[in-house]
Amino acid sequence: MSHRKYEAPRHGSLAYLPRKRAARHRGKVKSFPKDDAKKPVHLTAAMGYKAGMTTIVRDLDRPGAKAHKKEVVEAVTIIDTPPMIVVGLVGYIETPRGLRSLTTVWAEHLSDEVKRRFYKNWYKSKKKAFTKYVKKHSDNNGAAITRELERIKKYCTVVRVLAHTQIRKTPLKQKKAHLMEIQINGGSVADKVEFGHGLFEKPVSIDSIFEKDEVIDVIAVTKGHGFTGVTARWGTKKLPRKTHKGLRKVACIGAWHPSHVQWTVARAGQAGYHHRTSVNHKIYRIGKGDAEDSAATEVDVTKKKITPMGGFVRYGEINNDFVMVKGSVPGVKKRVMTLRKSMFVHTSRKALEKVELKWIDTSSEFGHGAFQTPAEKKQFQGTLKKDLAASS
C-alpha cells in the first residue's frame, strides 16, 4: 500500500457508548452546580421548549480579535419558557454511597396537567392521585407537613424543589406537564427549606433564575435518526469505488483471535435520540414573547415580536417568556429542554463579554424571507386583489 499513513486515529468517540435510545424523553440533570452557603438562596435550573432558530447581528466586543468592533452574524436558538409551578420539596441526606432522599413534601393543590404525569391513561383513570395526601394539610393545621419540613431542616444537606412546566401555555398538543427536581443553592439548609416552601403553588419565571449574558448548559435528547449504517453513525472512511458487496462498510471488523467482535469496532445501529448535555451557551436575551417590541433593539427600533412572520415552523407562536441562547442546542423543535446554571465560574473574556444586539431576524422561515413585519410586506406589495374583494 503506497503512501500509507503511519497512524490512523480511530473514527468516532467511545466516550458516549452505548449509542442507544435514551431511557427518558426529558433531559435529566445528573449534577448541579456546587453549593455556596455565602451566596443568596436561588434555583439552579429550569425547563423550556425548543421553538426554533433565527439570526442576529451584533458588534463583537473582543479586544485583540480581528473582528473586534465589527459586525458579526450569529445563529441563535429561541426556547419557549412559560413560568414553572413549584409543587413539592425533597430533602437529601449524604451517605457513604451518595445522596439518599429522606422525605418529600407536596403542595396542597396540584393542577391536572401535573397529575397526568402519574397516570398511563388519564381518560380511563379515577383521578384519585393525592386525594389522601391533601388531608395532611388540613388535619391539625398541617402538623404532619410542618413535621416533615422540620425533619428536612434537621437532617438534610441538599434541598430540591419539585417544579413542573405549564405545557398548556405552549402551542403543543401534549397535555401532560414535565416534572423535575431543581436544586436550591445558597444560604443555610433552613433558608433553603423556607425559600422552597414559600414558592409552593407559585409561578417561577425564567428571569428569576437566569440573567442576560449568563453562560448556561442545555440538557436534552438529540434528534433521532433510527437505524443507520456505520459510515453515517461513526464517520468511518468509505471504501474504494470497486469494492465488492458495498463500500459504506468497515472492511475488517477484527482479527481471527480473539474470536469475537470487540466492542470498540464501529458497527451499524441506532443513531440519534441520545441524552446529551451541551455546555457554555451564552444568553443573548430574556424577554416576554407577547411584548410588541420583544425583537426590537437600540439600532432596529421597529416594533416586532420575537415570533417570525407565519410563526416558527413546526412550533407556532411564542406568547410566554423566552430565552435566546447562542448557537444550536440538542433536540428537535417542540422537545423539552432542561436549562442549568454552569457548573463552574467563567473567567474568560469571551464568557464575560457584554452582548448588545443590533438586529434580530423575524422574516418568514418559509421561502426567502424578504420582509420583517406584516406592515413592511403590505407597504411593499400595495393593495392586492384579495384586499379589494374583502373590502367590497
Swiss-Prot record:
Phylogenetic lineage: Eukaryota, Fungi, Dikarya, Ascomycota, Pezizomycotina
InterPro entries per UniProt: L3_arc_euk, Ribosomal_L3_dom_3_arc_sf, Ribosomal_uL3, Ribosomal_uL3_CS, Transl_B-barrel_sf
GO biological process, alphabetically ordered: translation
GO molecular function, one term: structural constituent of ribosome
Subcellular location: Cytoplasm
Protein name as it appears in the record: Large ribosomal subunit protein uL3
SUPFAM superfamilies: Translation proteins
Keyword Cytoplasm: yes
Family the UniProt entry places it in: Belongs to the universal ribosomal protein uL3 family.
Keyword tags: Cytoplasm, Ribonucleoprotein, Ribosomal protein
Pfam families: Ribosomal_L3
PROSITE patterns named in the record: RIBOSOMAL_L3
Function summary: Component of the ribosome, a large ribonucleoprotein complex responsible for the synthesis of proteins in the cell. The small ribosomal subunit (SSU) binds messenger RNAs (mRNAs) and translates the encoded message by selecting cognate aminoacyl-transfer RNA (tRNA) molecules. The large subunit (LSU) contains the ribosomal catalytic site termed the peptidyl transferase center (PTC), which catalyzes the formation of peptide bonds, thereby polymerizing the amino acids delivered by tRNAs into a polypeptide chain.
Main location group: cytoplasm
GO cellular component terms attached to this protein's record: cytosolic large ribosomal subunit
Subunit note: Component of the large ribosomal subunit (LSU). Mature N.crassa ribosomes consist of a small (40S) and a large (60S) subunit. The 40S small subunit contains 1 molecule of ribosomal RNA (18S rRNA) and at least 32 different proteins. The large 60S subunit contains 3 rRNA molecules (26S, 5.8S and 5S rRNA) and at least 42 different proteins.
Keyword Cytoplasm: yes
